[in-house]
Structure formats: structure tokens, C-alpha cells
Amino acid sequence: MTSVRYVAIGDSFSEGVGDDLPDGRQRGWADLVAQGWANARGSGIQYANLAIRGKLIWPIVEQQLEPALALKPTHLSFNGGGNDMLRPRADIERIADAFTRVLRRCDDEGVTVILLSGANPSPQLPMGRVIQRRGDELSRAVLARAEGRDDIVRALNWPDRVLSSPPFWSPDRLHMNARGHHRVAARVLEALGLPVAGEWWSLPEATVAGPRGWSYYREHVGPWLRRRLTGTSSGDGREAKYAEWTSVAPSGPSAR
């Protein structure tokens, strides 16, 4: 059996923000994929995750891609652009060009790309119509760059209307909760041709209610706007949670 060395790069989506464990750590779909992959093989895999929240797409590529490739992975997952789409201006073609760079460099190194589109938060966000339009445009632009490439593993989350519904999102309405991360992990494992624990597609709904009205703007939108105005990021000073390989051993059929 060939070895699997899987590395994830990206922003909060791939870091796992919103999937909070009791000990304070954040797990996320990429961690779940690593566990599900090891379970399906019945043997361990190597896993690294260089994703850092708050990153725009080109800083992801410029800061994470080469360190990820230096690890000599067999598989690399990539998603980005969500933070770019929240800015006043978003150059869709330039964002999509980042995907071209990742595909080219992975081709150079013989690495299989797992290409993800992000989950769609627009139905519940202020300026949701703008975000929806930009996300649709970005999805088309990225898929055009991957057209005819049967060697790319595609896990397309943006069109998933179930995933866009409130039960899959954290109180900030911008990051998925554990339920959302499990659904994305299920889609990635399915795209890899691996078995998926059926409940991962739709875990029991959490009962935690998020803030509404002005409370939502005060708790979540206000801090985000302050970071934009001060030129800071939620990822400033944060290091990757798995910058080097960590071994993931098989466990039971569910990694919850």
C-alpha cells in the first residue's frame, strides 16, 4: 500500500475555525478528512495543515504553498478567496489566477491537488447578494482553469444549498460549525473514492442560537470592520497548527 502524505493550505475554512473541541482546539474538515482517510485505509497517514485564518488568497499562495511542497506531500488541498470576496473590491480573475499557480506548482512536483470551493454563507450575511454573485463568478473561473483535468480531485461545496442553511454555521454566520465541517469532510472523502460515515453528511442539529439584530453586528460585524480599518487580520501572529507532519492512526468508524 502506497503511503499518503496529505497537506492542507488555505484560510479559516481549511484551518477549521468554527469546529471547536471541548479542550479549546479547533478541528475542521481537513482534520476529519485525515482521520477518515486513515480509517478507510486501515493504516496511518501523514498529515499537515498550514492554513491560517484571515488570509487573502495570494498571501496563502505566497506564504504556504512552497513550505507545503517542501514537505513532499502526495496530496495537497487548496481553497481560498473567501476573504477576498468580502472586500469592497474583488478581482475575480486575479483570485482565480492563484488556483492556476497552485495547479502548476503541484504539477511540477507530482502532487495530486484536492480542489475545494468554499461553503456559501451568503444567504445569511449582510451584502449577501454581492457575495453570492462573486462566489458564482469565482466558481466558474476556477472550474474553467481546471477543465479537462481528470487528475484533480474536486470537492465542490459552493453549490450545496443544504450546506448554506443556518444549521451548518457558527453564530458569526461566516464560519461553519462542526456540522458544516463534517459535511465538507464527507464530500472530500467521497471525491477521493473513500467510504464516508453516513452521519457525517448531516450530524444532529446543534441547539446553540446566535445573536440577532444589533447584537449580531456588535459581536461579529463590528470587530471585522475594525480589523479592516486598522489593516489587521484575525490571523496576525498565528502559526499553522500542523506545520510539520503529524501521524494520524486509524480509529473507530466515526472521528467525532
Q: Positions of the model-derived regions?
A:
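Conserved catalytic region of serine esterases and O-acyltransferases that act on ester linkages
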Residues: 150, 172-175, 179-256
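Substrate-gating cap/lid alpha-helix
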Residues: 123-158, 178-182
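Serine-esterase "nucleophile elbow" of acetyl-processing enzymes
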Residues: 1-53, 65-72
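Short glycine-enriched, charge-decorated loop/helix-capping segments at active-site entrances
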Residues: 19-24, 90-93, 128-132, 170-171
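Charged, glycine-enriched surface loops/patches
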Residues: 93-116, 149
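Aromatic/hydrophobic pocket-lining residues that form the small-molecule binding cavity
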Residues: 61, 95, 99, 135-139
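Oxyanion-hole/transition-state-stabilizing segment in secreted/luminal serine hydrolases
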Residues: 15-19, 43, 57-94, 120-121
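Active-site segments of SGNH/GDSL-like serine hydrolases
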Residues: 79, 83, 105-136, 157-165
